[in-house]
Amino acid sequence: MAVVDLFDLPREGVLLGIDPGTATIGVAATDRIRMMASPVETILKKKLAPSLERLLHIYDERAAVGLIVGLPLNVDGSMGPRAQSVRTLVSSLLKVRDLPVTFQDERYSSAEAGDIMRAAGATRRNREARIDASAAAVILQDALSRLERRP
């Protein structure tokens, strides 16, 4: 299936969102009716193969129909080394399993996730442990908002 446009993802079913970082991959999922996105877990990215295996396990466990990947664009919208690293990760994932993947601009998602967690009263330690999964939920919720405005 490879990389597709957001509007080409299946119209129904669970979507998984990820916030790929240098040391971790934050994972979030929608509910079946795509009303909201929730943090699922943070995968430690020590080695690529086990990280991708865990991600695909979550994908299967949740019966997901598509993957939304946060793309860390530069402030001006251009692609830098971090964005290229994410594209390489997705390429590696697609070599393991052919599934529908789309990219979502993730600028400021970690800051927004931190603000949400602070407002909810999360301790600093809790925020640090869950920030990547929470950022994945922000990325996924942004994609859901875009899907609501589907032409």
From Swiss-Prot:
GO terms for molecular function: nuclease activity. Its EC number is 3.1.-.-. GO terms for biological process: rRNA 5'-end processing. It is found in: Cytoplasm. The keyword Cytoplasm applies. Its main location: cytoplasm. Keywords: Cytoplasm, Hydrolase, Nuclease, Ribosome biogenesis. One of its GO terms (cellular component) is cytosol. PANTHER family: POLYNUCLEOTIDYL TRANSFERASE, RIBONUCLEASE H-LIKE SUPERFAMILY PROTEIN. Could be a nuclease involved in processing of the 5'-end of pre-16S rRNA. Belongs to the YqgF nuclease family. This is Putative pre-16S rRNA nuclease.
